[in-house]
Amino acid sequence: MISKINGKLFADMIIQGAQNLSNNADLVDSLNVYPVPDGDTGTNMNLTITSGREEVENNLSQNIGELGKTFSKGLLMGARGNSGVILSQLFRGFCKNIEGEKEISVQQFAESFQAGVETAYKAVMKPVEGTILTVAKDAAKAAMDYVDQAEDCVDLMVHVIEAASESLDNTPNLLAVLKEVGVVDSGGKGLLCVYEGFLKGLKGEKVEAQAPKLDTESFVNDDHDFHGVINTEDIVYGYCTEMMVRFGKNKKAFDEQEFRNDMSEFGDSLLVINDDEIVKVHVHTEHPGDVFNYGQKYGELIKLKVENMREQHREVIRKEQDGIQNKATNESKTVETAIVTISVGDGIAELFKSMGATHIISGGQTMNPSTEDIVKVIEQSKCKRAIILPNNKNIMMASEQAASIVEAETVVIPTKSIPQGISALFQYDQESNLEDNKSHMNDALETVQSGSITFAVRDTKIDGIEIKKDEFMGLAEDKIVISDFNQFHAVKGLLSKLLNEDSEILTMISGEDADNSITNQIIDWIESEYPDVEVEQHEGGQPIYQYFFAVE
């Protein structure tokens, strides 16, 4: 009979729960609705609870209240992805309920499950039923309904697991997309794995490891460790050049298409934003003076910036060779406003950096950074203010959680894709205050449609589309709109959904697996089918996704 749970027993439960989730992480990942090759729910929940487990193992206590604080802190800082954040919030509420206790009774055990559910629901802006939240809620309700009959904590835990399993099986009836794909909710399955491990711990049993231990080191990659791979002499256009031009009455009439065409002759990485009174330009060029002279044809130059990217690159190489440049570089940086972007791909990181991002965290579709990764970057920058660009919907909650922890005044711009992040960052003005920048950057999100091309990792049917393993899928925002074994056909199908007669600019970001011949084929097709659309092509170097597209 186990009528009480103390810190030592709770630690055993946590360790076995974490191990059971680790053993089943791949299974949980396989339940993800979209068949994209991302490490997602299982990976994120596993990394999150592993962070909590490691914190517990390093700070063991007989006092369950103290151990709960330790576990909650580890989960909070290690939370990755939306599923990881929700898991951390479930146990934040659970552990808050046992605060100050040396040990807890069966009644308190049941009440703690309920407290966790209440905390998690409050943390999610728009709770969706048929998810991990529902499984947790149904399990907690069962615990509260059964607690008076429970013989001990083991008996209660058995009942919690039965209710969670039944709730998990019912998730397809609550969420249509689960029923269409033929899976149960992945987050709910992950939570059930944790609960099953808890029961093992309560009974004094051990979950044997079936998977290699995960490396939970930070994914911070500020200033990029990849500079040494690129030769300075390989930089074709050496000056990152920006200008703002206020249109003049007696100057040349502004035609945006003509302006873009002429500007594109000066270099690459061209970005142009026009608001009828002012045009803002970002371009990498060999001749900044020519860019400024051209801008003066249209009006008054009000803001200019030129940075020598070759010299910046040499400096980074020097620091790396001296052993100065590493993941801890952030500690030496002090900025008034830290602009933190999350991205993956050398080219994308370089583009963000050239546009003013002060810190790059390596992460995205294939690996979500933790709350702690984001917190560390902001705190080590010693900034007064911070702006976070998640650039992925699954990094949003960790970003918001980080913003609530740090001392600096911090805002999260809800960018769900790399193209949205680029558009938002282009609106940043270092002379403006945080609220104005937040407003302008949020407004920029309304002007961008995002698309991407990747491949399917399994057969499925979703949104009415039959998908075969290894087909190329076109996603408009988060919705699969086409699937085809021919990559070019998939791209055409996707762009036909994104482009229309009002489209002006198409930004194409090529991934590390993009084929140059297909890239050229795409550009030729766009120029033929959509002659009024200006194409801007960048080498992003991102894995998994052959192309990102942005339509404005």
From Swiss-Prot:
Gene3D superfamilies: 1.25.40.340. Residues 8-200 form the DhaL domain. GO terms for biological process: glycerol metabolic process. One of its GO terms (molecular function) is glycerone kinase activity. Coiled coil: none annotated. SMART domains: Dak1_2, Dak2. This is Uncharacterized protein SERP0792. It comes from Staphylococcus epidermidis (strain ATCC 35984 / DSM 28319 / BCRC 17069 / CCUG 31568 / BM 3577 / RP62A).
